[in-house]
């Protein structure tokens, strides 16, 4: 088990966003490794680059593979949309026709919020990558129903020892 605190995860997500902001452009599928090394970063790339810097990712993967990885690493999957307001973590959305499948259409990192809006880091388009982030005061359903909440990956808490991710068996 490799330990990582919530503050450390927030910091590596910030570093991944700063990397994207400084030198990357959007690509629908970023299959480079390390993620973003080719100057491209999709929305899942933010998650993968952060996890690579934290030592949990060792290869390029697509969005669906990354979603499976989160469970394998020991993140807790929450299907309660209210957790987006109260927790930090990777939030995943899908198009309505993908509900009930494993497919994910968009990923961002939530920093929690006030019950109406959240703050977040988000890549996946040049305007997002070029923006000053974290975004603050964003409505959770900013897509007006074109995307629906799928789930959120949250770090499990370990009493008195920070937060741990499961790596390997």
Feature-to-residue mapping (PLM):
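Viral virion structural and adsorption modules
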Residues: 1, 163-169
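...with weaker cross-activation on analogous glycine-rich loops/strands in unrelated enzymes
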Residues: 6, 10-13, 48, 56-149, ...
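Active-site nucleophile-His-acid catalytic modules used for acyl/amide transfer and hydrolysis
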Residues: 11-41
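Short helix-capping and hinge/turn segments at secondary-structure transitions, especially at repeat
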Residues: 18-21, 52, 56
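Generic alpha-helical secondary structure signal
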Residues: 21-23, 30, 89, 113, ...
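Surface-exposed beta-strand edges and flanking loops
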Residues: 28, 151-156, 167
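Active-site nucleophilic cysteine motif
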Residues: 35-54
């Amino acid at each position: 088990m490799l330990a990582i605190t919530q503050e450390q995860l927030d910091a590596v997500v910030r570093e991944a966003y700063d990397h994207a902001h400084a030198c990357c452009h959007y690509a629908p599928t970023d299959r480079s490794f390390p993620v973003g090394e080719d100057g491209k970063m999709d929305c899942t790339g933010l998650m993968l680059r952060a996890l690579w810097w934290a030592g949990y990712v060792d290869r390029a993967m697509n969005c669906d593979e990354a979603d499976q990885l989160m469970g394998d690493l020991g993140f807790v999957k929450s299907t309660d949309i209210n957790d987006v307001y109260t927790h930090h973590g990777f939030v995943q959305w899908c198009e309505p026709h993908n509900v009930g499948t494993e497919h994910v259409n968009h990923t961002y990192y939530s920093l929690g919020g006030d019950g109406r809006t959240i703050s977040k880091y988000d890549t996946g388009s040049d305007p997002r990558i070029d923006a000053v982030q974290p975004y603050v005061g964003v409505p959770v359903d900013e897509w007006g129903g074109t995307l629906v909440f799928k789930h959120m990956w949250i770090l499990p808490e370990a009493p008195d020892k920070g937060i741990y991710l499961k790596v390997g068996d």
